[in-house]
Amino acid sequence: MKKVLALVVAAAMGLSSAAFAADAVSTTQAPAATHSTAAKTTHHKKHHKAAAKPAAEQKAQAAKKHKKAEAKPAAAQKAQAAKKHKKVAAKPAAPQKAQAAKKHHKAAAKPAAQKAQAAKKHHKTTKHQAAKPTAQPAA
C-alpha cells in the first residue's frame, strides 16, 4: 500500500525513476534493520514526499474546478430555468380550466341523483308499513 502511494505521488511529479530507486532502497534496508526502525525511516521519507507533492496537485485541481464551475453549470442552469418557466405557463394552465369545468358539471348532476334516492327511501318506508298490517291478520 505504501509503495503504491509512493508510486502515485512520484508519477504525479514526473519523477517515476526516482520513486523506483527510493522503493528499491527502502526494500533492501527493511530486511537488514528491525521492523520498527524500518517503518519509521520509510515512513518519514514518504511523509516528506507526500507533503511536497500533493500541494501542487491540489492547486491544479482547484484551478480545474473553478473553470468548470464557471463554464458548464452556469449555462445549464439558465437553460433549465427557462424550460421550467415555459412549461408552467403553457401546459398546466389549460388543463386546469378544463378540469374545473368538468367538475362543475358533475357537481350539478350529482345532487339531483341524491334527491331521487331520498324520495325512493321515503316511498319504501310507506310501502313497508302498509304491507305489514295486512300480513299480520292473515297470519
Swiss-Prot record:
InterPro entries: Acid_shock. This is Acid shock protein. Its main location: periplasm. Required for growth and/or survival at acidic conditions. Belongs to the Asr family. Residues 27-139 are annotated as: Disordered. Residues 1-21 form the signal peptide. GO terms for cellular component: periplasmic space. It is found in: Periplasm. It comes from the Bacteria. Proteolytic processing gives rise to the active protein. Disulfide bonds: none annotated. Pfam families: Asr (PF06392). It comes from Klebsiella pneumoniae. Residues 27-40, 52-61, 90-99 have a biased composition (Low complexity). Keywords: Periplasm, Signal. Residues 22-80 form a propeptide. Residues 41-51, 118-130 have a biased composition (Basic residues).
